[in-house]
Amino acid sequence: MKKIALISDGWRRMITYAWVDGIIRRIRELDEDIALYQYNCYGNWSKDALHNTGEYNIYNLPDLSAFDGIILDGSNIVDVWQKEKIVERLQNCGVPVLSLDWYISGFYYVGADNRRPIRELMTHLYEVHGCRRFVFAGGPEDAFGNFERVAAYCECLKKYGMTLDDNPILCGDYDYETGVNYMREYVHSGSKLPDVFVCANDNIAAGICAEAEQWGYRVPDDFLVTGFDNLDKAAYFRPQITTVFQDREEIGKLCVDVLLRIWEGKPVEERNYIPVTCIYGESCGCPNNGMVNYREYLREKIVATVKKDEDDSLLVELEAQMARCNGFREIFEYIVDYFQKLRCDGVYFVVDRKLFAADEDTDFPVEGYDEKNLVVADGFENHKRMAFASVGELNRHLEETGSQNAYLFTPIHFREQSIGYLVMKNGRFLYDNPYYYDIHSTIVKTLETQFKQKQLENAANKLQMLYNRDPLTGICNRIAYTDIIRPAFAKYQEKGIACALVFVDADDFKSVNDTYGHEFGDQVLIRIAQVLEEECPQQGYVCRYGGDEFIGFFPYATSEKAQQYTDHVQSRLTKENIMISIGVELTFAGGEETIDEYLSLADQNMYRQKQMRKESRKNID
């Protein structure tokens, strides 16, 4: 099986699924044994540079040399450093690289011939509609498509003996708001309007038309407008916008054809173009082209709106479910269930295992991924839950079953720190609902909130441990008797489980301190604490009650277990010449006595043992 990598950056919050659809359609039409791996981010959407760093890190995940061909959709990468970095990696990977709608020396260009349709539009405007004053309403100055369209515009001006001073070029973005701003600036400047705005795309054209109407102008009565791309907002706008049709799915299909020719050793042109067509409409003074079915369009929009509402409701429901979760495992279960309701064939979550620990000092990678710590947290495929022992096992599964399928890899990160990534198989819903960023960001924000909450809980637990620990001996202190032992006693008492209360006091400790010094006395206390804790049965506690007094507590107690505990402790300490007195009291399951009452009885038992030992020594003397 051959593997193709598609490196892409979303357009704002949207993902261009048409490339993927065209690629997979062509692979299946030809019945080729090929899999598509898409690595997509949204590095141009956030204003937070560190967040964008975390997005672009997904490009560091693949071993590019392991692919048979690579397709770069880099026209939306606005970070110059990131753009140069990925281009350099691709130039050095030793694999044939195709670039979509962006010419890069050494790569094969696949896309539209941006110059030819602009020449055709300019000729039409000049010869058919008599335009003599032009403005090119452009997109980003450094965007390749915009650059090519500007170049063709300039060629035509030169051909007609016109200058840029009289026929200027405007630079902005590719969005609707750019067109609105262009029109406002013209109105506010008081400049004479041109005969035509030649726009870099349909978004800009629609913005100009709409804003012109706000100021009392009408297109095409007062001036003409043309667009590019043949988006719905061109075909169904009022006025219908003259535009250029380019089929993005055909670009995807052409990518497959070019790679097949390369793999077969056949000659391939450096630039590979899809057919494009100028579509003339009302905005340039031509009649409605009649190529649209308004009722069918409205029907599709209504159905799409209903479906979008359903998808949004599912996302809102997921958000509410995740907010009620107590841990990451539960969150991942809900997310996987959510994706099973969408039109996709599978999803896998690969995350750094440090996510689950949520230690307060945890750091995640900024460059690349901590592969030795990556685990498959959860996933499904074809409505069946899947589990993998390692990421390597998942990767082998993807390769073994990947033929004629598309895998989408998107980053999971907390700002610049990379936690892992999500793998989605055949996300067909993205064609009708391209706002995948909304889904992805909701999931990531929930994971980050859970992580920070766990960090706070862990930090609070550490502080509580310090608060409940005796600094000298390291065992629980008297506060822990109230905070830990007392609640434990109440729990076992309610369940009818007998417990043992043990009261311990060091014999003649004042004399030890006076004779050998306080440092020696401290070591005696430390040793008593160690032995008490080491011999304490499971689920039990030992605490320093004060001075040379200690308390032991353990459940599921019997007289034999209690006697065994005291015998072992005293035997070990006696061998080290450390003498203690111990009193034990067993609780009565279901009784009404308080723990303090039982402790008082244990204290009395300890005191009796201490007195007996003193009497015994007197008799010996």
Feature roles, as predicted:
Residues M1-A49, T53-E317, C325:
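Bacterial carbohydrate/catabolite-sensing allosteric modules
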Residues E317-Q321, E457-R478, I484:
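Amphipathic HAMP/coiled-coil signal-transducing linker helices
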Residues Q321-F364, Q538:
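Helix-loop-beta substructure at the N-terminus of cytosolic sensory domains
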Residues H397-E400, Q404-H413:
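A short, aliphatic-rich beta-strand micro-motif
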Residues I412-L422, N433:
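Short hydrophobic/glycine-rich mini-motifs in sensory/regulatory modules
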Residues R428-E448, E457-K462:
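Amphipathic alpha-helical "output/dimerization" segments
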Residues N477-A500, D507-E534, C543-G547, I551-G552, ...:
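Conserved long alpha-helical elements within nucleotide-processing catalytic cores of c-di-GMP signaling
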Residues H518, Q563-Q570, T574, E585-D621:
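Catalytic-core segments of nucleotide cyclases and related cyclic-nucleotide turnover enzymes
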